[in-house]
């Protein structure tokens, strides 16, 4: 075979065997993405279709007339950019499995030339080297990448739960801030009436000036509290929109509801202490730490396997002076100067770190479960006390009205009783808010919704490819 024929054959084989991916540009414009973010809407028909595919949700009409926790959480799963980042990271981790599974490519070398003083004698040489991995290195790489990919998928679930938790807390905060403003407006009206009646009695010489001054100061202070509460409504509204992943303007005009916010469950009805064991074994951060530990195990196995050198098998061919020569060369690295001790020691240390992180994650879960249950029980007890106080003051208010109707009390006494009831109602509302927030901490510790009627805690599919 002539040298030029050999070269043509090799070139043809190389070109046929190479099928590289083509680069596709994906330009991104900050101005365009900002416009897309600002144009997000809860009325988006694509959101409607995606929400229906999540199971347990059936919109009576679209756009929704009201938005509750279930629908707002689904909207957050659709819009929140943190989930997009987590999904992208999970996809990158999946791609790492492909990288780990790749086998090393063979190499080829061609060396044509001429021999003799006149260069009339052609020479052609062709060498082919096929690397062969030994000791199961490829399998350990795949196992390592697979466990890290699983950890990344679990982190996606962890991010989804965090999004749900933030939406829940933000919705509770907003609804209770609106309720606080309503109560404060009513209390301001009562304070005004109290000041008016006190002024009348002062001018009649029935009360001293300090009593009137105190009433006026209380009214001024309450108005300042109302002004701050109005600002808090706007702040919590914006916080809820941010938790969903939409601009504040997209949430304007939407009717937000939570039908059972006033009736949190009794602490005794919460999952029993056996739920601690379930959380210790199944919370996503624990499972993620376990996958990272298994990845560290595979990493250590890979470094140990690297003690055994790979083999290169190299069949060769040469043509010289009209004769064909075949050869077979087997080569390998001689592990004389080191046996990969350093990387093995690092991998062993990384496995210890991963084991310690798993234990720390379980310890955190245990503390979270116990602390959140205790915090909820305390908040619920405070709520019960505040509810009882409201009931007592409402009875006193009714008694004052009865005395007024019987001519045995004046209007100021009734207004004073109404003010006491109003203050106690605000205290009860604050206790209810703290109870609901504490209940959210219990859900976070167990990483599952305590209301069986709500939708899944995690999205079933990605809203975008």
Show the residue positions of the predicted features.
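Small/polar, glycine/serine/threonine/aspartate-rich low-complexity segments that form flexible
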Residues: 55-66, 109-137, 141, 251-269, ...
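Transmembrane beta-barrel architecture of outer-membrane proteins
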Residues: 71, 123, 169, 214, ...
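Amphipathic alpha-helical coiled-coil segments and their boundaries
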Residues: 72, 79, 86, 131, ...
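A glycine-/polar-enriched beta->alpha junction
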Residues: 75-84, 91-106, 118, 126-144, ...
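Heptad-repeat amphipathic alpha-helical coiled-coil interaction surface used
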Residues: 90-92, 97, 142-144, 149, ...
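Periplasmic alpha-helical coiled-coil/stalk elements that build and connect Gram-negative outer-membrane
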Residues: 138, 154-278, 375, 379, ...
